[in-house]
Regions:
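Hydrophobic transmembrane alpha-helices and immediately adjacent juxtamembrane helices
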Residues: 1-268
Length: 268
């Protein structure tokens, strides 16, 4: 057991180091995210002003916090649907992964999480600093909410990686998964609240979106860290994230085992 945990720890570190090899890309991502963040500030601040100082339950300060937190998470939460494991499934190299004494799904998710965590260093943290310095942000006043916010943030990253793994696992049955990835890219960002807070949606759409795992990937950690909920409310959101992670992880196991059987039947 201890050896297995150590191996997954090494995979996490390997993913982190892999992310560090793309420093110029990270810098480009930072510039792009800050630029779009400033555009969102202009648009959403105008919406707040037009609504009389509050829209969707967000005042100007909370809207700024939403903007910069969501932008800071862009490098770590995969809304594009692409992954290395998708390519390995497509070209058959995943058969080698199945020969290793590791769970393919867990190893993939852990590695992706390591890479995502690195992105917070050159992209996430600087964006929060820029947003806080030049625009202003509201932050939790309670240590408990801070802790729950960080936990929620980590759960969002893991849930994102686990959900993208499901997109890749469809490749056991489809020759090409780019169409699935495209649908995921369109739906996930919108439903996660990447463009506007989901509280600005019509009520029926907000309820429908809350029945998906996507708000747990961005909206819920932002809600907690923007100090919009009490400790009890934060605990509830974290519990929802844990439930979605368990469900997505379980479905990933089912698809992995079924995909492996299909691979063995077709490939010998």
């Amino acid at each position: 057991m201890r050896a297995t945990v150590r191996v997954y720890g090494l995979l996490l570190v390997a993913g982190f180091r892999r992310g560090s090899t793309y420093r110029l890309a990270a810098l480009g991502g930072l510039v792009s995210n800050v630029t779009f963040g400033l555009l969102k500030v202009a648009v959403l601040f105008a919406a707040v002003g037009a609504a009389g100082g509050e829209v969707g339950g967000y005042d100007r300060a909370q809207m700024s916090t939403y903007i910069w937190l969501s932008q800071a998470m862009l490098g770590s939460v995969n809304f594009f649907g692409g992954s290395d494991i998708a390519e390995r499934i497509k070209d058959g190299q995943v058969s080698v992964d199945f020969l290793r004494p590791l769970d393919v799904q867990a190893a993939t998710v852990v590695t992706e999480v390591g890479q995502a965590l690195f992105a917070f260093v050159p992209r996430g943290i600087p964006q929060l600093a820029i947003g806080g310095l030049f625009v202003g942000m509201t932050l939790p006043g309670s240590v408990a909410v801070w802790v729950l916010g960080v936990v929620s943030l980590l759960l969002a990253v893991v849930l994102s990686a686990a959900t993208v793994y499901l997109v890749a696992a469809v490749g056991f049955w489809l020759v090409e998964t780019r169409g699935v990835q495209l649908v995921y890219m369109v739906v996930s960002g919108f439903f996660a609240g990447l463009f506007v807070p989901i509280s600005m949606f019509p009520r029926w759409l907000e309820l429908a979106v809350q029945a998906t795992p996507f708000p747990s990937m961005l909206m819920y950690p932002v809600t907690v860290l923007a100090d919009r909920v009490s400790v009890g409310g934060a605990l509830t959101l974290v519990a929802v994230q844990v439930a979605w992670l368990a469900g997505v992880g379980g479905l990933g196991q089912v698809l992995t085992r079924a995909g492996r059987r299909r691979l063995e039947i077709q490939g010998g």
